């Protein structure tokens, strides 16, 4: 999701997955099994949340409760991971850089949480792709996908992150980007970038899964012709999903931003389930949210997702909690722990998952 005040950003910990019951097996690398995910000895449907802000926390205790490209060095106390300046890329491996992510991963390992680690953001919040565009003198946003200097710096960051966590079972998947778009582009542009980047990641780490992080745009299956189903944003969901080095599909849902009805979200979910079923890969309903009436509007999507063949997990946007500094960021979509919204969106949803699958 694009946020004007806060971010979904480069080096994002975009999602956290947890089994809706105590794992029956030993911790290990997450994988796919047909149209489902397998996590720590369980195969089935899983639930989780998006918590982009965890990677920026400076208080380790806050991490236990619960990333950023720049063109100039931020002020003291700001976490950032990569600096683009004077045509050069510098990876910040210090205490206010990747060492922060180290602790997030360590905490996830300790608490049995699986992380989706994202490498760049389509949007400008906290830098994103346009930080690369500006840093290497490219013309516009869409140059990110094919500019040689940009891709060299992007892969430098990928290598720096992947190499730190190749042995961590807390990593659910590596994600190419948050909501990559190439408006007005031929679909070959994103396809070629997805194919080459996912192949590169697999060459560094063949054990962890790789996903795109896209919104699911560009799909013929069950299409009603509305904007999200079109190819305007340069994406072809089914074609991209068929790339061998992409392990599962991702799709998002924000009707208020896309000009669709809330009920339409059920069609969108079913369409992607059908596309993933045709591809023989599971789908992750990776982001969804509204700014009000969470229980009334979002729980029907959860029920549809749980009962749609081809969809094997969902992550609502976004998790909220009370930190040492106060409440975690709230963009209006936030569902805070301990609230009535949390009960319907999480507690009741997990109970439904457990009941459907016979998990205790």
UniProtKB/Swiss-Prot annotation:
Catalytic activities: Random hydrolysis of (1->4)-beta-D-mannosidic linkages in mannans, galactomannans and glucomannans
Residue positions the entry lists as glycosylated: 307
Class of this enzyme: hydrolase
List of catalytic residues: 179 (proton donor), 287 (nucleophile)
UniProt subcellular location: Secreted
UniProt record, GO biological process: mannan catabolic process
Main location: secreted
SUPFAM superfamilies: (Trans)glycosidases
Any Gene Ontology CC annotation: extracellular region
Keywords: Carbohydrate metabolism, Glycoprotein, Glycosidase, Hydrolase, Secreted, Signal
Job description of the protein: Endo-1,4-mannanase, a crucial enzyme for depolymerization of seed galactomannans and wood galactoglucomannans.
The family this protein is said to belong to: Belongs to the glycosyl hydrolase 5 (cellulase A) family.
Protein name in the entry: Probable mannan endo-1,4-beta-mannosidase A
Source taxonomy: Eukaryota, Fungi, Dikarya, Ascomycota, Pezizomycotina
């Amino acid at each position: 999701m694009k946020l004007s005040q806060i971010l979904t950003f480069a080096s994002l910990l975009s999602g956290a997955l947890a089994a809706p019951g105590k794992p029956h097996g030993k911790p290990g690398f997450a994988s796919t099994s047909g149209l489902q995910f397998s996590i720590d000895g369980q195969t089935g449907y899983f639930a989780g949340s998006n918590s982009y802000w965890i990677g920026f926390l400076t208080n380790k205790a806050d991490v236990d409760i619960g990333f950023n490209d720049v063109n100039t060095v931020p002020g003291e106390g700001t976490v950032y991971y990569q600096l683009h300046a004077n045509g050069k890329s510098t990876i910040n491996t210090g205490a206010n850089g990747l060492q922060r992510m180290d602790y997030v991963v360590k905490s996830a390992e300790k608490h049995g949480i699986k992380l989706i680690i994202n490498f760049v953001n389509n949007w400008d919040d906290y830098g994103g792709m346009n930080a690369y565009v500006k840093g290497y003198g490219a013309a516009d946003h869409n140059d990110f996908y094919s500019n040689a200097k940009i891709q060299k710096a992007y892969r430098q960051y990928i290598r720096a992150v992947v190499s730190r966590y190749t042995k961590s079972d807390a990593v659910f998947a590596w994600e190419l980007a948050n909501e990559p778009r190439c408006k007005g582009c031929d679909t070959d542009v994103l396809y070629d970038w997805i194919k080459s980047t996912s192949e590169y990641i697999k060459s560094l780490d063949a054990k962890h899964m790789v996903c795109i992080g896209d919104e699911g745009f560009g799909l013929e299956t069950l299409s009603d012709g509305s904007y999200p189903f079109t190819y305007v944003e340069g994406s072809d969901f089914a074609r991209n999903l068929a790339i061998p080095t992409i392990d599962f599909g991702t799709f998002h849902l924000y009707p208020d931003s896309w000009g669709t009805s809330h009920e339409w979200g059920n069609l969108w979910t079913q369409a992607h389930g059908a596309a993933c079923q045709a591809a023989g890969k599971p789908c992750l309903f990776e982001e969804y949210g509204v700014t009000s009436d969470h229980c009334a509007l979002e729980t029907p999507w959860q029920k549809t997702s749980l009962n749609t063949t081809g969809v094997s997990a969902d992550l609502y946007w976004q998790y909220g909690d009370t930190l040492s500094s106060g409440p975690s960021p709230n963009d209006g979509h936030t569902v805070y722990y301990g609230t009535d919204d949390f009960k319907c969106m999480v507690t009741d949803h997990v109970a439904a998952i457990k009941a459907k699958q016979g998990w205790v």
